């Protein structure tokens, strides 16, 4: 069973993703409450997380820069953890392009469009 930490601004989307992953019985999912993005480091280290799925947006706690900074810190603590970013390519095409670049630069393992 894989441990996944989900950190999203949109609570409804976070709940839906967590529910879908849990139903497969292949994943144990922990969610970080909106606005509590600082909890990601300690929660991922405590589990330890196999995958960290995070939403990126223009809001300060969810920016690509802050997410990549967290990934850099977590990579040192949990070398086997995989990182996936979720973004809305329709409402912010430039942010979506930056996420694709982060994948091409191998700073993240995967990205998803919402």
Residue ranges and their predicted role:
Residues 1-4, 13:
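Non-catalytic signal-transmission and effector/linker regions of two-component phosphorelay proteins
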Residues 7-8:
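Conserved acidic carboxylate
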Residues 11-33, 37:
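Two-component/phosphorelay signaling modules centered on CheY-like receiver
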Residues 16-21, 69-73, 95-104:
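Short, aromatic/basic amphipathic alpha-helical patches
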Residues 37-40, 50-77, 87-90, 95:
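Conserved phosphotransfer microenvironments
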Residues 46-47, 106:
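Active-site charged/polar residues at nucleotide-handling catalytic sites that mediate phosphoryl
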Residues 87-114:
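Output/docking surface of receiver
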């Amino acid at each position: 069973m894989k441990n996944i930490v989900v950190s999203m601004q949109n609570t409804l989307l976070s709940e839906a993703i967590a529910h879908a992953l849990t139903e497969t019985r292949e994943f144990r999912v922990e969610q970080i409450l909106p606005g509590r993005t600082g909890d990601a480091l300690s929660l991922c280290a405590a589990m330890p997380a196999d995958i960290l799925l995070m939403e990126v947006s223009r809001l300060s706690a969810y920016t690509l820069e802050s997410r990549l900074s967290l990934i850099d810190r977590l990579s040192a603590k949990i070398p086997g953890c995989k990182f996936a970013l979720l973004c809305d390519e329709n409402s912010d095409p430039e942010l979506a392009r930056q996420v694709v670049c982060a994948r091409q630069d191998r700073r993240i393992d995967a990205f998803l469009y919402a």
